[in-house]
Amino acid sequence: MPSVAIAGAGLVGALNACFFAQKGWDVSVYEFRKDIRTMKHVQGRSINLALSQRGKSALEAVGLKEYIVNQGVPLYARLIHNKDGKTYSRQPYGKPGEHIVSINRRHLNEVMITQAEKSPNVKFFFEHKVKNVDYDKKQLVVQCTSQPSKIPTFGNKSPPQEHAEFHVEADLILACDGAYSAVRRSLMTIPRFDFSQEYIEHGYVELNIMANNNEFAFEENVFHLWPRGHFTLIALANRDKTFTVTIFAPFSEFEKHMSTSEDVLSFFEENFPDAFLLLGKEHIADTFNRVKPQPLVSIKCSPHSFFDNLVLMGDAAHAMVPFYGQGMNCGFEDCLVFSETLEEYGNDIAKAVKVYSDGRVNDAHSINDLAMYNYEELKDLVNKSSYKLRKKFDTIMNSIFPKSWIPLYSMVTFSRIPYSEVIERRKRQDKILSRIMTTTSTLALIGAAAGIYVNRGKLGL
């Protein structure tokens, strides 16, 4: 059977292992961390994940959708918390019943690793760091960072010694090693490989609201949002009745208003009074004493495939800011689209990797841009009357033209319409709306002029 070597056992790497296990391929996965299933605490991001249609479709293809969805908390709307801490407004995500699912990142990752390992042809190699790619041999260069271990027979004559580097040969290489991908970095000298990286001015800090007498402290089936202009607080429910709370703010804001315990407590009490009471002074102060704000990066690159057997996927190809909840969903859709492409081309790897990259780059760039736009919506626009009017207009148009007029959020979240097509559809909607507004304004102006003419005598004109 064909063989695939996967760099990274995170969300996208683990899901790819599940896909290729189904296909019967020989699968080897190399991960620099220890097995997270054996660890008490896992370093790295823990922002809760919002599973939507694209991610669900990928999980369904490997038989995990139902189980994973049942492990999460459904969210049907945004709940906007006003600054007084007492009043709220609710914005449903889509049509009645449409929802996203709040999922714990670590649990999801563990489930997929365990699922993939059920296949005898799948091997995970933890504490094995992918260093780079050997261009000439089209192989991964891996370093064993702990004790020697058995390495798959393809391309290796003997197990490596501790800290020794070795080459991994496979018919297909999938780089799923994250935003700071070692594989992608080693490809940077290849001519015509385009790459861009942007750190936004905002960072984030995570906190937790504990269960209240074994009950949720807030309403659980909504996405809690405290939009305050240039900074924002969000909260998502977990199955254990806790909430993961995240504050996004410019680094300058963290330095100015959250650098001491006294300052951060005053800041939270003033801007998020209801959350402040549930988080508690001690937890807020302790968290900000221990944790520094983490950066947020947006990465684009093109192409996503190299040679005739290597593909970049997930954050290695398109790291994005988390404000559309599509980082995981896009990465999972990468796995699904590539699997579908391989099947379409009869497992012709060389053809499949090129076709995949040609089609996926534009989609990845598109959702990257949409994620940046959605932060403007989350931190400010949701409270503006123009945004609310547009949302109502989209809802009305969708009820009249359900197939041809789909709201932007619904296209991204509740469909598998390619991201690039989503943007084109939105542009057409904007043009139509602009014409309607122009026509309406013109008619209103003509009507006003006619009224003035009829009443010119009374008006002394």
From Swiss-Prot:
Protein name as annotated: Kynurenine 3-monooxygenase
Protein task: Catalyzes the hydroxylation of L-kynurenine (L-Kyn) to form 3-hydroxy-L-kynurenine (L-3OHKyn). Required for synthesis of quinolinic acid.
Transmembrane segments: 395-415, 432-452
Source domain of life: Eukaryota
Pfam families documented for this protein: FAD_binding_3
Claim: Magnesium is one of the keywords in the record: no
Pathway membership: Cofactor biosynthesis; NAD(+) biosynthesis; quinolinate from L-kynurenine: step 1/3
Biological process annotations from GO: 'de novo' NAD biosynthetic process from L-tryptophan; anthranilate metabolic process; kynurenine metabolic process; L-tryptophan catabolic process; NAD metabolic process; quinolinate biosynthetic process
Protein's organism: Caenorhabditis elegans
Family matches, as InterPro entries: FAD-bd, FAD/NAD-bd_sf, Kynurenine_monooxygenase
PANTHER family, per the entry: KYNURENINE 3-MONOOXYGENASE
Reactions performed catalytically: L-kynurenine + NADPH + O2 + H(+) = 3-hydroxy-L-kynurenine + NADP(+) + H2O
Entry's localization field: Mitochondrion; Membrane
Molecular-function GO terms, alphabetical: FAD binding; kynurenine 3-monooxygenase activity
The enzyme's E.C. designation: 1.14.13.9
Family, as annotated: Belongs to the aromatic-ring hydroxylase family. KMO subfamily.
Co-factor(s): FAD
Topology term for the membrane: Multi-pass membrane protein
GO cellular component labels: mitochondrial outer membrane
Gene expressing this chain: kmo-1
UniProt keyword annotations, A-Z: FAD, Flavoprotein, Membrane, Mitochondrion, Monooxygenase, NADP, Oxidoreductase, Pyridine nucleotide biosynthesis, Transmembrane, Transmembrane helix
Range of residues in the leader sequence: none
